Structure formats: C-alpha cells, structure tokens
Amino acid sequence: DLKPEDVIESNHYWETANASALEQYCNTFYPKLIIGQGNPNTDGAMEFISIDCQSDNIYSTGANNIAWGQNLVTTSDSQWSWSIIRGCNEFLNNYQRSPAGESAKNQYAGEIYFFKALDYFNKVVRFGDVPWYTKPLTTNSPELYQGRNSRYEVMDSILMCLDRAVELMAKKTNVARVSKDAALALKARVCLFEGTWRLYRNLEGSEKFLREAYNAAGELMKPEYGYSLYNTGNKPYYNLFIQDNYTGNSEIILSKEYDASINMGHDISRTLPLSNYGMSRDCFEEYLCAKTGLPISQCSCHKNKSSSIEMRLRDPRLLQTICNPADGEDCYYLWKTVNGKRVGGAPNIFSYMEGTDDRPYYGTSTTGYCIAKYYNPAEYVDLRFKGSVDSPIFRYAEILLIRAEAGAELGEDPELDKTINLLRKRAGLTFMLSPTPPAEGEDPDMIEKYPDIKGPNAYLIREIRRERRVELFAEGLRYMDILRWHCGHLLNRPRRGAKSNMYTAKELAYLTDKVPIKDGFIMPYDLRIDYQPNFTEKNYLFNIPLNEISLNPNLLPQNPGWE
C-alpha cells in the first residue's frame, strides 16, 4: 500500500530532526496557508481582490455563483482535504522526540498550532461542522469514518490551538514568519468572526468569543509590541501596499514575501490593468464627505456632481484605493493601445475592440472605478512575474477595527480615539467618530443595510462596519464579514457602477450602445441573462461533498438547504 506523501515514513526521523529540520517541516505549510496575493509565478493571481469579488465590494465580468445562487451541489471540494491537518498532527505527536533545543521546539510547535487553527477555521467558515482529528491517520484508522464534530466543539479546539501558539512562540522578529504576534492577530480575527456569527443567529457562546477577540486585540495594542499605523509620505494608505519589504514597518504583523530577482515574483501590477475588476458604487458610497464628515445620503456637496468630481470630495482613502478617470493618461491604465491605436470608447469601463466580432476587450474596469490599491507603477511591465511588492497578511489597522467592533458589541469602551479615529487621522480626515450620531441623525442607508443591529450601540456598530469596509477594501475580508453578520441580503442589492455623467457626450453615446445605464448609473450586469441575485440562507455554508458522504455516511446530515 502507498503511504501518504506528507507523512514521515522513518520511525527514526524525529530522533534526528534538529532545529533546521523542524523549520523546514514548518516551511511546507507557508505556501499552502499564507496565501497573500497568491503563490509566486502564478498567472493572474490576485487572491485578495478575487475573494472580495464574492462580496459587494468588487465586481468582475465573471459570474458570482454564490451571490447569484448558482453554486450547485458538488461531488468533490478541494477544501475538503485533510493533508494539512494530517501533517500538523504528525508534527504535534512527535516533535518532542527531536534533539533540538526547547526554544526551537516551542517556536515550531507554535507555528504548527497556528497552521492547524487556520486550516480548521477555513473549514468551519466553509462547511460548519467538520471532523476534529488529533492524530495522524492511516488508511486503517477507524477515525476516518467518524462523524462531524459540532461547530461548538471545533471552535473551542481552534481556540485551544491558538492559545497554545501564543504561549509557545516568541514575539515577532521576522515579519514573514509566524510569531506570537501573528497568533494573537489570527485569534482576534477568528474570535470576532465566531462571536458575531453566533450573536446574529442567537446562538450561545457569542460573548465568550467576542471577549477573546477584544482581549487579543488589546494585547497587541500594548506598547511593548511596538505597533503603530504606517504614516509616511503624502499618501500613506496607498504607499503601505506597494512596498517591497515590510521589515521594520510598524503596521505589518505578518507578510508574504515576493522577490522577482530570485524567480519568486508575482504579476499583480501587470494583471490588475487587464483584470476588468471594479469597485462597486455601493462601496463607493460608504466613503464619507471629507469636508463635512457626512455620508452621501445626508450631504449636499455631491448632488449633481460627476463621479470624478465626487472622488475628490470624499475620504482621501478613496483616491488611494481607486483612480480617477479625470486624471486622464496620468491614471495608470485608463487607456489601452492595440497596434498603435487606442481602442474602446470611454476610459475606465470594460470596452469593446473595434473589429468584426465585437468581442469585449478587458483592459479597464467593469464599473468605472479602477482599483489602484496594490498597483506599483514601477512594476507595470510587459514581462510576467516581475512583481516584488510584498503582501500584508495581518496588519495593525485590522487589530484596531477588531478592538472597536468587539468592544461595541460587548458594551465595552471601543476606545475610539485609540482605534477608529487613529485610522481617520492617518487618512487625513478632520472629523472623528463619536458614540452618538451627528445632529443630522443616522445614515438611513446604513440602517437599511444593517437592520438587525439593536441596542444603545447600534449607531456606533454600523459606523465601525463602514470604517472596516473602507479601510480593509480588497483585503479578502468583506465576504466573511457578510457571512458573520448574517447579511447575505447585501449580495442581492442592485449592482451599480459609476455615474454615467462622468463621461463626455461622445463617450456616453458609445457606452449606451454597449453598457446598460439605469437611473444615471452604469449597470455592468444587466446584459447578463444569467444575473439574478439569489443569495439564500443555505448559501452561508457549502455542501459536504457527495463523494465524501458516499465514503463515510457518518458525515450526514447534509448542511441545511443542500439535502
């Protein structure tokens, strides 16, 4: 019988595995779980942006099968794979036999606990209840046929793994390596997810996980960890995401490294101009007015203004996240050239090549709001895999947002001047968030989006959610936010792009021929006959793969709605 490739065969391996061998063992998990923008030399990899396309933040020209209710019952699923867990259990059951020193064994065991927690968390988000395994299994192990453990059991076990990781590892010394700091950051993220998942479904245990999130974030905010928001240059938010090395950066807790000079580059600055992604109008509208601090629904500054003018009136992070079509050729990829000739009609909209078949030329954006975040002009080259900009995995800004949200949900002090308002100051805003609404009252659009928030902190929680969406745009977290808040209805809202009045008459004449316009907004999906928003309750989880149930009927019952 063939043995699994990721299981150490020799009974003597662990007795001779020194610190270097333990490190090499841990290294195999980084490309599997620390994804960043994708693994080096992967064509078209932009993982954070692709994940945000599952949400209401970013639209692409492809189908969103989850939001459209088109994902079918699957027979197999690559995420129902247990090789990572098997590898983690192999290490945890044997590493104490290593002759390495205690500090090395503790560090690498902590890394493995981190990876086990992360892989299991990804499985819980996708499937809910899953089997919990504590030892490496063989083809004859009876545990292969056990049923699924409850979400409650699995999440408690994940929390145990994270606590062990925090206990065993030292503080960060290498920004590209898992540390105590990274384990605290993952703990804060995981516990915020689970606490709010339970809270907005009236399930027991929500306060426990929210408290863990609040405390983990608070620990990282202590001065001895040395974190602060990056605030260099006149566009610090934009500049944060185009750096080749995060060593010494006060905001980055963990990053994924790339280096084109050693054939470990990525393609994001080359691919982004060709990707046809675009920020949604719904996301655009959550950026507050820079002059008044008011939302678009309450501010007269923006009435009858084109999108390009609106951009300059908003929270400065907007124009550090997307680019303005009014900037013309100074905006990095509004115009594309084929055979020495500009093609397409209006800039900033996915357009059509002149020719015999009218095929779409995907050179710009679905919505008119081209994404500038992560784009480094110095890396915009025709050659592939020449990008060396590193990818933040955890950053201090998220920790501040977790502290504020968990605190507000618990009724604790969200420490606004140490959390949300630090983010606003870094952005260059002069208006700060307070616990009570302004004289103009609450934003009716936010109340409509989040009607389930109740209690004295309802306004504050809604505004923290706004801040989270703005600050963490295109970082792969919005879809999980929608899941945990039980807000799948947001994916059923109309999918609008930019205002059509930001185009000239000539451009608009071209656009109306190719891109639907409704109530003054570009509607990028209205030409798709398969576009029917239909996110329902079953879509909060995926089905258990049918092939797995055939092999192990104890995995039943199937997830709700997938029977």
Regions found by a protein language model. Give the residues of each.
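Short coil/turn linking the two alpha-helices of tandem helical-hairpin repeats
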Residues: 124-126, 131, 173, 193-202, ...
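Membrane-proximal, proline-rich intrinsically disordered regions
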Residues: 1-42, 549-563
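Conserved, well-structured interaction surfaces
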Residues: 14, 18-27, 31-35, 59-127, ...
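C-terminal substrate/ligand-recognition segments
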Residues: 316-425
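Long, intrinsically disordered, low-complexity segments
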Residues: 1, 81-82, 157, 237-293, ...
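Extended ligand-binding clefts on enzyme/binding-domain cores
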Residues: 228-359
